[in-house]
UniProtKB/Swiss-Prot annotation:
Ubl conjugation keyword on record: no
Name of the gene encoding the protein in the UniProt record: rplL
Any GO MF annotation of the entry: mRNA binding
CDD domains: Ribosomal_L7_L12
Keyword field: Ribonucleoprotein, Ribosomal protein
GO cellular component: cytosolic large ribosomal subunit
PANTHER family in UniProt: 39S RIBOSOMAL PROTEIN L12, LARGE RIBOSOMAL SUBUNIT PROTEIN BL12M
Subunit text: Homodimer. Part of the ribosomal stalk of the 50S ribosomal subunit. Forms a multimeric L10(L12)X complex, where L10 forms an elongated spine to which 2 to 4 L12 dimers bind in a sequential fashion. Binds GTP-bound translation factors.
Family recorded in the similarity comment: Belongs to the bacterial ribosomal protein bL12 family.
HAMAP family found in the cross-reference section: Ribosomal_bL12
Organism whose genome encodes this protein: Bacillus mycoides (strain KBAB4) (Bacillus weihenstephanensis)
Name of the protein described by the UniProt record: Large ribosomal subunit protein bL12
Signal peptide start and end residues: none
NCBIfam families in UniProt: L12
Length: 119
């Protein structure tokens, strides 16, 4: 079978048949059809394009009761759950929020004396 005959055979296949062919080739030769990922310079670009942020309570500070109230307001947790979260710092308060939401939460918590990190 020539290369041209193989190409013609592939052209006549359906998408499902092509998918099966790719899987069979991967199994037969121990390779994957995944595209290579560029590693160099990726970390700097990823940091610049970050769209989801985690708000982490680093410490409650001196005004623990006010921090618990703020945590309850932000998260909607009950009193017991909010107290446990504040007592077990550092702890993520909210994950996967926008930069604006994260900055707003950070400002509210720092206003009552908490130490907060946005990651």
């Amino acid at each position: 079978m020539t290369k041209e005959q193989i190409i013609e055979a592939v052209k006549s296949m359906t998408v499902l048949e092509l998918n099966d062919l790719v899987k069979a080739i991967e199994e037969e030769f121990g390779v994957t059809a995944a595209a290579p990922v560029a590693v160099a310079g990726g970390a700097g670009e990823a940091a610049a394009e970050q769209t989801e942020f985690d708000v982490v309570l680093a410490s409650a500070g001196a005004q623990k009761i006010k921090v618990i109230k703020a945590v309850r307001e932000i998260t909607g947790l009950g009193l017991k759950e909010a107290k446990e979260l504040v007592d077990n710092t550092p702890k993520a308060i909210k994950e996967g929020v926008t930069k604006e939401e994260a900055e707003e939460m950070k400002a509210k918590l720092e206003e009552v004396g908490a130490a907060v990190e946005v990651k």
